[in-house]
Amino acid sequence: MTTDHSGPPPSPGTEAWAERSRSQAEAFDIIGERYDEAFPHKEGQEQHTRRLIELLPAGSHVLDLGSGTGLPTARQLVRAGARVRGHEISPHMIELARTHVPEAEFVRADIMDLDPDERRYDAVVAFFSLLCLPRAQIPTALGLIRAALVPGGVLCLSMVEAEADDVPIPFVGARVRVTGYGRAELRTVVEEAGLVVEDERVVSYEPGEGAPPETQVFLTCRRSA
């Protein structure tokens, strides 16, 4: 995957950004249940969540950014005793998540709408959600996430390793825009946002039919006190 777009990505707060968000949401509405069919085995994601659970006391407040269908992450966290709030742009994904994990709270919200003054979290998980943003907005998103964490709070994130910036690709029957980094550059971007990377894992992943093989990078990060 290489960088290839026809012009600079739009900025949040503009009509072009709103249209981009609508287009992304519509794409994930189309994908719906097929997401879990295309990515049936999420061992790396599940293992990363288990490591997070080991770091948190029961009853911790956790924000799931890009919560999708609620599986497997929100369900894992709820079963471990966490209080989970999910942010998701796709109304259909939210419906599925509320069915799969009724104990969690799911709301329609863009990552860039995150308000650190509204609520603070012991942990934030962002599995493959930041890749839906242009590179220009990812440092801002990481800054919002850091501000939404309590001092010492944990961020678990993952991205697909790729050199890409807001590239449109066919994805499980829809078309979405995605971004990627090499693992070293991703780590640098995260650290420059004021987060300390405590653990890095790289997973070679073979999705289900209709999606190409990929290399996934998982980072466990912490907001310093």
Task: Annotate each PLM feature.
Residues 160-177:
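Short, glycine-/aromatic-enriched active-site segment of Class I SAM-dependent methyltransferases
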Residues 114-124:
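A short acidic, Gly/Pro-enriched loop at the edge of an enzyme's catalytic core
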Residues 139-151:
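A short glycine-rich, Lys/Arg-flanked "PGG" loop and its adjoining helix->strand segment in the class I
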Residues 206-225:
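Core SAM-dependent methyltransferase catalytic element
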Residues 178-194:
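Short alpha-helix
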Residues 152-159:
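Conserved beta-strand signature within the Rossmann-like core of class I S-adenosyl-L-methionine
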Residues 2-58, 163:
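Conserved class I S-adenosyl-L-methionine
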Residues 63, 69-113:
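Class I SAM-dependent methyltransferase SAM/SAH-binding core
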